[in-house]
Amino acid sequence: MSLYLHKSHNVNCIIYHIVCPTKYRRIIILKRIDQTIKNICLEITRRYDMHFLEIGTDKDHVHFLVQSVPMMLPKNIVQTIKSITAREVFKQNPEVKKQLWGGAFWTTGYFISTVGRAGSEMAVAKYVKNQGREKEYKKLHTDQITLFDGL
């Protein structure tokens, strides 16, 4: 669970759920790229007033759960994350640049939403953490028939 950030003139708890797709939705975020992105985000935390509460990767997009301060605009948070991660991924994994012929790692678009402190923060954190994993659906009734059982 996130903590309140105490600054000289305010106390806050602002959390954003950010989703950034790769350029052309290319499937390039494999194990090594996933680890590279997470390591880069640790460096971003050290240099900027933003804290990554959770990072979840799928093959063609990344979910970030980020806590920041009111002085940082949401678009600047996204811009910082996307620019630094792209530059460092290309530097540490030059073969990725060949797969993305336009020279950009991320698309220009993104999704961003605020996350409430109470119940939704844990729900979104769980969702972000489980990115890229197979969905586990619970079957309610073992004898339950489906629409196409007879076919």
What are these regions (language model features)?
Residues 1-151:
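Basic nucleic-acid-binding interfaces
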